């Protein structure tokens, strides 16, 4: 048996942990630059605020209904996610972190399924303040189905689907578009052929499914029938590339501002590489103007820079990124977005050094480790490269950002005795 734990309205729940007066009031969380709605509390959903809604179009709705609006605080959400996963790991020996707010758990050795799920749910709520729902079933896909119903239709937030008749009933009521991995395109394709529910899907000939939905679709159908095709993967596969990109908070024209932004993004990529114990051999940079503003000159370009030796050193990766930027920057244009991608990633212990390497890698490794330690303890970018800048006018617009309660010393809550 496999269980899926899914945090309820995760971003909104994170905001409530340190602001308990937000319980039972409508909350929305906005995307980068406070553009669109990317998370909603149940109260906001009842007001008819859809996912992806442009924030400016719903300002009157927010004001009229006293909706609390937050800029996305990914530092807070990421840290609370780690705390949720750490708490669950103390109860479950074998688990797979599927996303920032989802984790699959191996329940094959659990005898009292519902009781164990309720125990995990209660512990996560007590230790982290985050509410979760848990669905338990024979396969990952069915666990997703069970979680869907646990979240929407049960008071306890826990549902076990292990009875064939109960599974069939659940699939008959489940819209095919709600299935794991079935996006809008496939949902529309299936609906046009009269396949409306998950139960309709599993009644199709498997050869037709494979032909029209690839082998991934076939495995989904087999999972819904109770045959396990996707095992628990305790260790996430190493990334093939890492990208850091952002839309700018205002119009950017100057090379200096672009250089600061690209240096900051390259530094973030380097930190992620070190966190994985990996190194990259290629650094790519891209720039784009605003594709939705046709009154301005349109431009999009990228440049790939090959490193002589794979590295995770911020100094080397930033240098390569700036080299790439200088090759694609055009004066006079208004830029909306930039990004850095590191690729050709290899494990750090498999890097082949050069006899003529001029870099003292042991000293650089110590330096990067020291910088990471300080920034982890004191807050992001407390120690940074000068080229990253300090004014940073290009940064994201975050007018509704909550404090980083768990990752920044200056934002720690204080208690008066």
Task: Show the residue positions of the predicted features.
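Short, charged/polar, Gly/Pro-enriched secondary-structure boundary elements
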Residues: 111-115, 294, 346-353
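Short, charged/polar surface micro-motifs in flexible loops or helix N-caps
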Residues: 10, 33-36, 290-293, 345-349
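Gly/Gly-Pro- and Ser/Thr-rich, intrinsically disordered tail segments characteristic of DNA damage-repair
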Residues: 1-222, 361-417
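Short, hydrophobic beta-strand segments
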Residues: 103-108, 302-308, 351-357
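C-terminal hydrophobic structural anchor segments
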Residues: 322-377
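Short Gly/Ser/Thr- and Asp/Glu-enriched loop/turn motifs at secondary-structure junctions
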Residues: 98-102, 137-140, 278-282, 333-337
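DNA-contacting surface of Y-family translesion DNA polymerases
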Residues: 46, 186, 191-334, 350
């Amino acid at each position: 048996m496999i269980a899926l734990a899914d945090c309820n309205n995760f971003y909104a729940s994170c905001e409530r942990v340190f602001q308990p007066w937000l319980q039972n009031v409508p909350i929305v969380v906005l995307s980068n630059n406070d553009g669109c709605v990317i998370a909603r509390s149940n109260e906001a959903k009842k007001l008819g605020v859809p996912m992806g809604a442009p924030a400016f179009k719903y300002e009157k709705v927010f004001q009229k209904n006293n909706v609390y609006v937050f800029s996305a605080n990914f530092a807070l959400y990421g840290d609370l996610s780690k705390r949720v996963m750490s708490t669950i790991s103390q109860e479950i020996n074998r688990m797979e972190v599927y996303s920032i707010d989802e984790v699959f758990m191996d329940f094959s050795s659990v005898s009292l399924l519902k009781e164990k799920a309720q125990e995990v749910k209660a512990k996560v709520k007590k230790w982290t303040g985050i509410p979760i729902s848990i669905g338990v079933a024979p396969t990952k896909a069915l666990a997703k189905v069970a979680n869907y119903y646990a979240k929407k239709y049960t008071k306890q937030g826990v549902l076990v689907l292990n009875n064939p008749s109960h599974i069939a009933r659940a699939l008959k009521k489940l819209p095919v578009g709600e299935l794991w991995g079935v996006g809008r395109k496939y949902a529309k394709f299936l609906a046009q052929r009269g396949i409306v529910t998950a139960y309709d899907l599993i009644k199709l000939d498997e050869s037709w499914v494979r032909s029209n939905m690839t082998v991934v679709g076939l495995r989904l159908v087999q999972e819904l029938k109770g045959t396990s095709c996707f095992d628990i993967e305790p260790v996430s596969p190493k990334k093939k590339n890492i990208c850091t990109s952002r839309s700018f908070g205002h119009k950017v024209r100057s090379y200096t501002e672009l250089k600061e932004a690209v240096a900051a993004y390259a530094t973030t990529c380097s930190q992620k590489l070190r966190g994985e114990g990996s190194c990259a051999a290629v650094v790519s940079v891209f720039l784009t103007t605003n594709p939705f503003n046709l009154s301005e000159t349109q431009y999009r370009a990228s440049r790939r820079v090959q490193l002589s030796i794979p590295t995770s050193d911020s100094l080397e990766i930033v240098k390569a990124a700036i080299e790439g930027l200088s090759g694609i920057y055009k004066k006079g244009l208004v830029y909306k977005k930039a990004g850095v991608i590191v690729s050709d990633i290899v494990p750090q212990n498999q890097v082949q050094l050069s006899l003529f390497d001029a870099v003292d890698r042991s000293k650089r490794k110590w330096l990067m480790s020291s910088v990471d330690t300080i920034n982890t303890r004191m807050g992001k970018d407390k120690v940074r490269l000068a080229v990253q800048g300090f004014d940073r006018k290009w940064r994201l617009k975050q007018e509704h950002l909550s404090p980083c309660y768990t990752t920044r010393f200056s934002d720690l809550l204080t208690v008066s005795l």
